[in-house]
Amino acid sequence: MTSVVIVVSVAVLLGVLVITDSSWPCVFNSTAKWSLQHIESVTLERPRWSRVKKPSSSKWRHLRTILQWWQERRKQAHLLDTWQKQAMDMDECLTRYRDAKHDDICVISE
């Protein structure tokens, strides 16, 4: 029903489709008369919330949450990729500590 309202609205706005008194479409006929009451009765109907639309809105909400999570994950992955690496690896630090015979101090931190 909604698609019919959209098609009729677009056709009337473009002047391509004009509904005549006999309810047959006339293409490129701008002189034909059409009933305004018929158009208003079609376009003024309020869409009602149905059981079909509620699950679809929750699915859209779930999809939005997944996309937000994925975007945050990509940002974190980019930060980890561009993070400056430490000048010294942990094993290298321990090796230097053993080789220096306790003259150097190796600080191990996270």
From Swiss-Prot:
The keyword Glycoprotein applies. Residues 1-22 form the signal peptide. The keyword Secreted applies. A motif (RxLR-dEER) lies at residues 61-74. GO terms for cellular component: extracellular region; host cell cytoplasm; host cell nucleus. Keywords: Glycoprotein, Host cytoplasm, Host nucleus, Secreted, Signal, Virulence. It comes from the Eukaryota. Coiled coil: none annotated. Glycans are attached at residue 29. It is found in: Secreted; Host nucleus; Host cytoplasm. Its main location: secreted. Belongs to the RxLR effector family. Secreted effector that completely suppresses the host cell death induced by cell death-inducing proteins. The RxLR-dEER motif acts to carry the protein into the host cell cytoplasm through binding to cell surface phosphatidylinositol-3-phosphate. This is Secreted RxLR effector protein 89. It comes from Plasmopara viticola.
